[in-house]
Amino acid sequence: MLSPPGLMLQQTEALAQKIRLGRIEGCQYGEFIRDNVFGVVNNTFPFFVERVGHQALVQLVEDFLLQHCAMEPEFHHIATEFVQFIQHGTWVNQLDLMVLEYEWIAFSAEIDQARINIESCSDIVYQNPEQYTLSCNPTLHLVELPFEVSSHSIQITDSAPSNYYAVFRNAQHHVVSQKLRPIDVALIQTLQPSYCSSLQTFQQQTEAQLADFDVRLWIQHFTHLGLLNINTLGE
């Protein structure tokens, strides 16, 4: 509605003010909004929540509602706007912010609407590599982190950020955080962001630059994980 009636604007503003003023009597909707935001943050950013603690999170949600002009009510928009709110303030330390941003990347890969179409990497493919293309999973994000990631926890490392991960959603709709070596990052970056290489060309170029590197085994490994896609030329 581009031009809502004046009375509607007044009523909406009054409700928003009640919500922002806190948990006051007579504003059950405000309680609902706070609980909803709190639930979104808890479910989307569990590592971050564990690090900051319950009381600090309650205050962060309160500050978010009081100070951030959120425009979209959907679950994923609340999560994104909460991250933006934290990024533009001094609410948490740098390490906690990086944990939050990593979890947002994983969440972004989960809800990405891109279609994952994985063709098996069989011997037939390698018999005719000129007939196939090689590309990255469209939900892929490459990140460098000061911690190591497992499915249930993160482990802070003492050194400067040097843990490389590929975060993506596979064909089984699972979000994967795959640890990478520097050589993996370099090769994957040649296929990003949306570049689609001939399988034959990629093999030849890689073999020319890395004489002792088994590029075929490397491709098989990452197509099996779902990080790389092999498709018939023309698809």
Protein language model regions, located:
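A local structural micro-motif
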Residues: 57, 211, 230-231
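N-terminal, charged low-complexity regulatory/assembly segments
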Residues: 1-114
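Hydrophobic packing positions characteristic
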Residues: 66-186
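Short, hydrophobic/aromatic alpha-helical segments in well-folded domains
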Residues: 44-47, 186-187, 218
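A short, conserved structural fragment
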Residues: 223-234
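Short amphipathic alpha-helical interface segments
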Residues: 169, 173, 179-208
